[in-house]
Amino acid sequence: MTGIYDNKLTSGLEGKPKLIRLLETLRDHATATNLKWAEKLGINPSKSITCVKPEGTTSCLVDSASGLHPRYADYYYRRIRIDKKDPTYNLMKDQGVPCEDDVINPGNTAVFTFAMKAPKGTITTEDLRALDHLDLWKTYQEHY
C-alpha cells in the first residue's frame, strides 16, 4: 500500500475506528486469498501478506504520496541522477529539463531537476506532528 496520506480514510482523518476496520478487512481478505491460492497451487501459504511499500520512483509516476509518508511540501524540487550514456539523458537535456553535472561523478552522471506541485489540500510534513505520524504507523503495524 502506498499514498496513504493522499486519502482521508487511509490517513486516519476520518477517524481511527474507520481506519482500523478498513485495515483489518483488507488484511483478512488478503490472507484468505493467499490461503485459497496456496491450497490450489499446492504450496505453503505466505507468512507475510500485507506491507506498506516504502516507495520512491513509482509514487512519482502515479503522483501519490510515498508509502506511509506525507508529501514534503506544497511545492518542492525532485532531483534524479542519470548516467550520461542513457538515452533518457539526451532526451531530457534536448527537451530543456534543468540539468547539471553530478558533484561526485561529473563525467558520467547528470542530475535533472523537476519542479513539483502537490495536489490541493495535500497533507505535508509541516501539517503533521511526529507523534501523530508514529501513531498512524503503529495502527498499520497492529491492524494491517
Task: Describe each region flagged by the PLM.
Residues P54, L61-Y144:
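Catalytic alpha/beta core of large soluble enzyme barrels
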